[in-house]
From Swiss-Prot:
SUPFAM superfamilies on file: Influenza hemagglutinin (stalk), Viral protein domain
Annotated S-S bridges: C22-C480, C60-C291, C73-C85, C108-C151, C295-C319, C487-C491
Keyword Disulfide bond assigned: yes
Main location: virion
Organism for this UniProt entry: Influenza A virus (strain A/Gull/Maryland/704/1977 H13N6)
Any one of the GO CC terms: host cell plasma membrane
Site, Cleavage: residue positions: R343, G344
GO molecular function: host cell surface receptor binding
InterPro entries (alphabetical): Capsid_hemagglutn, Hemagglutn_HA1_a/b_dom_sf, Hemagglutn_influenz_A, Hemagglutn_influenz_A/B
Membrane topology: Single-pass type I membrane protein
Gene it is expressed from: HA
Protein name: Hemagglutinin
Taxonomy of the source species: Viruses, Riboviria, Orthornavirae, Negarnaviricota, Polyploviricotina
Subunit structure: Homotrimer of disulfide-linked HA1-HA2.
Lipidation (S-palmitoyl cysteine): C555, C565
Annotated compartments: Virion membrane; Host apical cell membrane
């Protein structure tokens, strides 16, 4: 037994003093966790949240182009030229429009703007225009310009929509008037006109002389004849009659002709569309701020490089894709396995099987070594850089896969188009659900691939070292190699950088292996001898026990008798 103990201690002494090199990976005190398809809450050294949840809370310039806030005027009040909105008449360019939903100055005369939602949608795609006079009021003939107390200007004087002319009788006459606008601007032109529907026939005759006037509007492709629909309607601003305002986009080279003998709101100013683009009309009471953003929502600007956002589906600009999720983390580091505090005999270094290394700097994978000069640790920058490139490609691929052509139209329509709004809502919700599901599934798959990639990279590095060392080392099975020769720091560096020459140390390694194998054989021989002795003694004890048991049984049954003679 003494020989066995001595042999074992000798083997331990050889192992402890051997030079060693280990392959391992980084571990940190990170609390980051990600989900995969097969597992939730996997600890990782690092991750990024792909969903942006923060915004500026203000309206900002979009990519350097300022928005326009309509102030106290609604979109309709601005377009038709409410006299209280003259400060907005100089607007020419914007990145998007902001409308206060409670703006007091809309249509000052009771009525409506026909196809209001469609016009709003059109203006969502306009970046700049110029207001220009289409037909001078004096060119129509023997009619007068009408004004109303419902539409007062900033001085309190009766006025009317500045982009329209309300013609009434002159000298108790209202002849048939007619004019044509020919679009020679080379651009699309927005033309407005309207029809006044009086309370009664008497009011009709008072204003227009004719009891049943008409208005005819026609272009090359369509024609519309309007008749007055008299009747009392719910009103405001002291008026009970009604005005309906129409619009049309006249393309270059097209003409539009107007003919009327009463109830006609003639076009005066129109808008030359100078630039189309991608915009939006946000309805909010939030005012503008001096800031710049690349993505604007109804609640604030988003400045982020993240792939997704959960702030607003109606975002404008270079925006992350909207999904319904609070958090979506993509693994960018390794599976985080805490380091083992006390490794091996006398705190010896250990490889990746026994956990990560907290001291690894500037790399995800690397080497630890132990020799007569001490211990050292170094990152393998080449394999780390390859992994970083792979993850960068992953993130870019996710962005590319999630870039779709779908744009929400929600928010461009008013109360008149409730069915369109309902349909838009359903489409938005369905598409958002699909995007959200696809995004989550994609990230879960990529997290699985990332963690598998890191495991494979560590094993590849281990296999690379094993091929270099060949028979000059013993693979301990835990990510470490026990070198069978002396290996100083320079020697360790050749193993790390792939320039190690195993033939240089082959003879020394062969002798060391024979020495270790001899100690193992002698130890095993002593073990076998000890086992033989123990086996013999155990067998004898069992045999004696059996004989004594037989004798006691025989005596108790009367088959055995002792005679004592004196």
């Amino acid at each position: 037994m003494a020989l066995n103990v001595i042999a074992t201690l000798t083997l331990i002494s050889v192992c402890v003093h051997a030079d060693r090199i280990c392959v391992g990976y980084l571990s940190t005190n990170s609390s980051e966790r990600v989900d995969t398809l097969l597992e939730n809450g996997v600890p990782v050294t690092s991750s990024i949240d792909l969903i942006e949840t923060n915004h500026t809370g203000t309206y900002c310039s979009l990519n350097g182009v300022s928005p326009v806030h309509l102030g106290d005027c609604s979109f309709e009040g601005w377009i038709v030229g409410n006299p209280a909105c003259t400060s907005n008449f100089g607007i020419r360019e914007w990145s998007y429009l902001i409308e206060d939903p409670a703006a007091p100055h809309g249509l000052c005369y009771p009525g409506e703007l026909n196809n209001n939602g469609e016009l709003r949608h059109l203006f969502s795609g306009i970046r700049s225009f110029s207001r220009t006079e289409l037909i001078p009021p004096t060119s129509w003939g023997e009619v007068l310009d009408g004004t109303t107390s419902a539409c007062r200007d900033n001085t309190g004087t009766n006025s009317f929509y500045r982009n329209l002319v309300w013609f009434i009788k002159k000298n108790n006459r209202y002849p048939v008037i007619s004019k044509t606008y020919n679009n020679t601007t080379g651009r699309d032109v927005l033309v407005l006109w309207g029809i006044h529907h009086p309370v009664s026939v008497d009011e009709t005759k008072t204003l227009y002389v004719n009891s049943d006037p008409y208005t005819l509007v026609s272009t090359k492709s369509w024609s519309e004849k309007y008749k007055l629909e008299t009747g009392v309607r719910p009103g405001y601003n002291g008026q009970r009659s009604w005005m309906k305002i129409y619009w049309s986009l006249i393309h270059p080279g097209e003409m539009i002709t107007f003919e009327s003998n009463g109830g006609f709101l003639a076009p005066r100013y129109g808008y030359i569309i100078e630039e189309y683009g991608k915009g939006r009309i946000f309805q909010s009471r939030i005012r503008m701020s001096r800031c710049n953003t690349k993505c604007q929502t109804s609640v604030g600007g988003i400045n982020t490089n993240r792939t997704f956002q959960n702030i607003d589906k109606n975002a404008l600009g270079d925006c992350p894709k909207y999904i319904k999720s609070g958090q979506l983390k993509l693994a960018t580091g390794l599976r985080n396995v805490p380091a083992i505090s006390n490794r091996g005999l006398f705190g010896a270094i250990a490889g990746f099987i026994e956990g990560g290394w907290p001291g690894l700097i500037n790399g995800w994978y690397g080497f630890q070594h132990q020799n007569e000069q001490g211990t050292g640790i170094a990152a393998d920058k080449e394999s780390t850089q390859k992994a970083i490139d792979q993850i960068t490609t992953k993130i870019n691929n996710i962005i590319d896969k999630m870039n779709g052509n779908y744009d929400s139209i929600r928010g461009e329509f008013n109360q008149v188009e409730k069915r369109i709004n309902m349909l838009a809502d359903r489409i938005d919700d369905a598409v958002t659900d699909i995007w959200s599901y696809n995004a989550k599934l994609l990230v879960l798959l990529e997290n699985d691939k990332t963690l598998d990639m890191h495991d494979a990279n560590v094993k590849n590095l281990h296999e690379q070292v094993r091929r270099e060392l060949k028979d000059n080392a013993i693979d301990e099975g835990n990510g470490c190699f026990e070198l069978l020769h002396k290996c100083n720091d320079s020697c360790m560096e050749t193993i790390r950088n792939g320039t190690y020459d195993h033939t240089e140390y082959a003879e020394e390694s062969k002798l060391k292996r024979q020495e270790i194998d001899g100690i193992k054989l002698k130890s095993e021989d002593n073990v076998y001898k000890a086992l033989s002795i123990y086996s013999c003694i155990a067998s004898s004890v069992v045999l004696v026990g059996l004989i004594l048991s037989f004798i006691m049984w025989a005596c108790s049954s009367g088959n055995c008798r002792f005679n004592v003679c004196i």
